[in-house]
Design a protein with these regions (language model features):
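Divalent metal-dependent phosphate-bond-processing catalytic cores, especially two-metal-ion Mg2+/Mn2+ enzymes
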Residues: 34, 80-83, 98, 149, ...
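Juxtamembrane or sensor-core-proximal signal-transducing alpha helices
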Residues: 2, 24-47
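Divalent metal-dependent catalytic cores for phosphoryl transfer on phosphate-bearing substrates
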Residues: 57-218, 222-225, 231-235, 245
Length: 327
């Protein structure tokens, strides 16, 4: 009886294990079909896209490292913010990594990739500069479709600037005497339709503008974040996203923690090698100063030469004799 019971247990355990294995295999096999049929990005696909070895992310890292670094920081910000407000943190993180892939088309026209070189916009009309900046959203959605990033990520790329105005070049056009149409300097939208898209919009604007802070203390960082977020809110960009005032407060706190950690000051460590060098020079100086007396006693014929060598050692030097002094 015991033997039969043991066999039955092993048989049932084997069946259950096989069933679990087959279920997992089927799930992985049909995941792409589900994504295509229902235009839904599964969690498995998001985790795959988060791998920094993905071709698009590698292109960002090599071709536009400034934008790549910006995207990494934004991805950390949105992940923390999404967790704070109960949004989809994985979707936010992945979308943030890809939100600026459209900048691959004209990388040198974005300030984070110029590395103190000439600003190409200086030779362009404001309208042309605005057109280039506006194009990165359209180009980004095209690349997202080509690489099958999924509808949710495409939507966030399309919405992460909403219908915002490119204020710098619009003001520049007005100052140059033109009569610009405001719609020519606005992103086509739509405004963020989900909390995840709104979180990416806020983090993107906050991170990019925080680079202008000259003395990024925690208080100034927090004030800066609140100013940027209030501006976006007052423009109505968040009206369709379902973010609440409570959510905005939590996002501000989360962003502040990330940026404060990014901009934290480091301790200036003392140069220990300098102290070691000074200590090692002292015996040499004492040795050189002792040499003339020793040689004066043993070799009277070089007394004047040694005296000249000793007088050539300047105060505070390492004790080296003049070029013509004795060894």
């Amino acid at each position: 009886e015991g033997f039969r019971g043991g066999n039955t247990f092993l048989w049932l355990f084997g069946i259950v294990s096989l069933n679990a294995f087959i279920s997992i295999a089927i799930l992985f096999a049909i995941s792409p079909i589900i994504e295509m049929a229902f235009r839904y990005t599964t969690r498995f696909r998001l985790m795959e896209l988060m791998n920094l070895e993905q071709p698009l992310l590698q292109d960002l890292m090599v071709a536009i490292p400034g934008t790549y670094h910006h995207s990494l920081v934004v991805s950390n910000m949105v992940e923390a913010g999404a967790k704070a407000v109960g949004a989809n943190s994985l979707l936010c993180k992945v979308a943030a990594l890809y939100h600026d892939i459209g900048k691959l088309a004209y990388p040198d026209y974005y300030i984070e990739n110029q590395f103190n070189g000439p600003n190409r916009h200086d030779k362009l009309a404001p309208a042309m500069s605005a057109l280039i900046l506006l194009s990165h959203v359209k180009k980004g959605t095209e690349l997202a479709a080509q690489h099958h990033l999924g509808d949710e990520i495409e939507d966030i790329i399309r919405q992460h600037h909403g219908t915002g105005l490119i204020k710098f070049f619009y003001a520049k056009a007005k100052e140059s005497g033109e009569n610009p149409r405001i719609e020519d300097y606005c992103y086509p939208g739509p405004r963020p339709q989900t909390r995840e898209a709104a979180i990416v919009m806020l983090a993107d604007a906050v991170e990019a503008s925080s680079r202008t802070l000259t003395d990024p203390t925690p208080a100034r960082i927090k004030t800066h974040i609140d100013t940027i977020m209030k501006g976006i809110f007052s423009e109505g960009q968040l009206d369709e996203s379902e973010l609440t005032f409570k959510d905005l407060h939590k996002l501000s706190e989360s962003f502040a923690r990330i940026l404060t950690g990014l901009f934290h000051q480091r301790i200036a460590y003392p140069d220990l090698n300098k102290d070691k060098k000074t200590a090692s020079d002292k015996p040499e100086q004492a040795k050189v100063q002792a040499k003339p007396e020793e040689k004066t006693e043993q070799r009277p014929d070089v007394k004047r030469t040694v005296a000249y060598a000793a007088s050539s050692v300047m105060p505070g030097s390492s004790g080296a004799a003049a070029p013509n002094g004795p060894e």
